[in-house]
């Protein structure tokens, strides 16, 4: 680690490069930090919305010997993987849904990652709302379900794409409004109130 920051041969600021695209980037400089850093990396990568983490092992950490102490990460101060629910926002969303004349539910992979397929089915059936799925959300709702209108987006079905521009309330569940789904944001669902879970 004595050469870090000296522009040494093949030195790359991997942490600096990857911070904008990873949930957490960290450089391990001592072998004794490997166990807790790996535990923290797995915790962060798999909590909230899953995403990549980066661990950069300095040469010291690779060659030093240390006693391995298994560790488990269950909490990180100031890290909030899932924000608290705002009760007023939930009430406002429920009112929009209850008063909607032409609602549409957009289903993404987050439903599957959260193992919420059954809750989704109950929700759309109880409210009698049609649903369209993103490519990665296709298996969240059976294709033969009467409220499943098919895949959304530029490679999707005509029906749900037309419905996004006719609905009065758009409920997005477990999806991120990727450009493959929305296309031109200037014209996408401008008439709708949007609820994003």
Tell me the role of every PLM-derived stretch.
Residues 1-197:
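N-terminal alpha/beta PP-like core and its mobile active-site loop of ThDP/TPP-dependent enzymes
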